[in-house]
Amino acid sequence: MLFELIFIFLARVLDVSLGTVRMILVIRGDRIPAAIIGFFEILIYTVALGLVIGSLNEPLKLLVFCSGFALGILLGSILEEKIALGYRGVQVTIDSEHGHIVEELREEGFPVTCWEASGKAGSKLVLNIFLKRNMAVAVADKIYEKDPDAFVVFMEPKHFQGGYIKKK
């Protein structure tokens, strides 16, 4: 009985975590990996569900099944943050006086496109940076170190073509 409860719990944690990753892949347009993950996700889910459906007179199994689902959501979202698949666009607006930030980022290998803009408080620079998703927060932190008043917007591009992307 204990082994079965542990199995149900871990199966739910695993299948829901896989489901989170699968959904991210679908949104990004990675259909084949999403389909493969989906196969294993539903296989694991069906086995766990079968153990619970066959024992509806044992509420502990249902509680464990639901608890595994809840923890799977939490772990799936943490896993998704850690693997950080894909790319992110970062648009930054800074005061023109902080123009040195552009060259510093380029020296570090970041692909920065920059243009002048006019804001309520004067002349601004708008920086457009596309990079691997796991690097986006680090770039924003570098910018905030130099200009705490920077306005930073993160975007999730679904498709893009051409240009330069920092690889590491």
Swiss-Prot record:
PANTHER family: UPF0316 PROTEIN YEBE
Family to which the UniProt record says this protein belongs: Belongs to the UPF0316 family.
Transmembrane segments: 1-21, 34-54, 59-79
Location(s) in or outside the cell: Cell membrane
Source organism of the structure: Syntrophomonas wolfei subsp. wolfei (strain DSM 2245B / Goettingen)
NCBIfam families noted in UniProt: PRK04164.1-5 (NF003194)
Primary site of residence: membrane
InterPro entries noted in UniProt: DUF2179 (IPR019264), DUF5698 (IPR044035), UPF0316 (IPR022930)
CDD domains per the UniProt record, alphabetical: YitT_C_like_1
Bilayer topology annotation: Multi-pass membrane protein
Any matching Pfam family: DUF2179
Keywords: Cell membrane, Membrane, Transmembrane, Transmembrane helix
Name of the protein in question: UPF0316 protein Swol_0526
GO CC field: plasma membrane
Top-level taxon of origin: Bacteria
